[in-house]
Amino acid sequence: MKLAVTLTLVTLALCCSSASAEICPSFQRVIETLLMDTPSSYEAAMELFSPDQDMREAGAQLKKLVDTLPQKPRESIIKLMEKIAQSSLCN
């Protein structure tokens, strides 16, 4: 769980850099599928970025880890992402 939360927070920090006023919709979809959808949906969302085999395997391992989290914390992480993206710190 700590790994998934850490990854999410690092991702949010990268998305909210001063050089980026908005989150790439495709990247946001990857994160949402990571947290809420099936492994096959997550893999399909990642394919847009042409990951190599090591990246695919790492993503699959991460998805398995995230899927062990209860539903409520995953929903809370999505809400946190939305809140951070809408924050004045990201604009």
From Swiss-Prot:
Keyword annotations: Disulfide bond, Phospholipase A2 inhibitor, Secreted, Signal
SMART domains tied to this protein: UTG
Tissue spec. comment: Club cells (nonciliated cells of the surface epithelium of the pulmonary airways).
Biological process, per Gene Ontology: embryo implantation; female pregnancy; negative regulation of interleukin-13 production; negative regulation of interleukin-4 production; negative regulation of interleukin-5 production; negative regulation of T cell proliferation; negative regulation of transcription by RNA polymerase II; negative regulation of type II interferon production
GO MF assignments: phospholipase A2 inhibitor activity; polychlorinated biphenyl binding
Keyword Signal among UniProt keywords: yes
Transmembrane segments: none
Region forming the signal peptide: 1-21
InterPro entries reported in the protein's UniProt record: Secretoglobin, Secretoglobin_1C-like, Secretoglobin_sf, Uteroglobin
GO CC annotation terms, alphabetical: cytoplasm; extracellular exosome; extracellular space; nuclear envelope; secretory granule
Compartments, record wording: Secreted
Keyword Metal-binding: no
Subunit and interaction comment: Antiparallel homodimer; disulfide-linked. Interaction with LMBR1L has been observed in PubMed:16423471, but not in PubMed:23964685.
Family the entry assigns: Belongs to the secretoglobin family.
Role noted for this protein: Binds phosphatidylcholine, phosphatidylinositol, polychlorinated biphenyls (PCB) and weakly progesterone, potent inhibitor of phospholipase A2.
The name this protein goes by in its record: Uteroglobin
Biological classification of the source: Eukaryota, Metazoa, Chordata, Craniata, Vertebrata
